[in-house]
């Protein structure tokens, strides 16, 4: 039986629907899309999206037949939240990082009946070198942000209940949300050049990464974890090298798609060298 990282305690004081939603959000089993759009002057937007639809469908199957599912199927929303409104609650960020986080927005789209659940973070940047900082902030605060939002949406039962998120005293430190493979690569975003190179020394110990290994087990059970990167350039690419890269006809859009299995089979698949 696959052991989930985040414990869900369906006690009487915890609303069943809220518990099920938290299970979906913090299971880590979801698809991710990162999209970078660069304007002529070097500014642009960075978007990180989490698609939890597959896990939501599995959760519905698990709860099939329960009376509470009638309430669960009614969950529906499409809302945008300015992160500046919650920046003070991001305790794991310093003051400078909070100011950057405050420039971002989070769009939540949920329709339980249609098995749709998406979280999409969007941040502006004035130059491409700022992308790395935005990614680091999301790595540190994404779970905290979504937990805070889930608490507001679901009430006291959602999001930040310590026992639900496996953060009681004595519990091991919470892992990052989802399949975070970025730490195994060195990425550089310069004017006119983007590169991503595998850290072979770190990757040699990937089998010790308990979080990724547990997600790999999920994938082997039929819950494939897809990862997609899209880069929209202001001009045609002069160079676009990488095993997983696809270049549009006008050479301005670069797409890379792969799975967690691809990462374990050949991590160089996610390397790239782009010049424009």
Give residue ranges: language-model regions:
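Positively charged n-region of N-terminal signal peptides that target proteins for export
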Residues: 1-15
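A generic structural micro-environment signature
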Residues: 7, 17, 35-36, 42-44, ...
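Sec-dependent N-terminal signal peptides
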Residues: 15-21
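C-terminal motif of bacterial Sec signal peptides marking the signal peptidase cleavage site
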Residues: 25-28
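Start-of-domain marker
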Residues: 30-104
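Mature, soluble, non-transmembrane domains
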Residues: 88-276
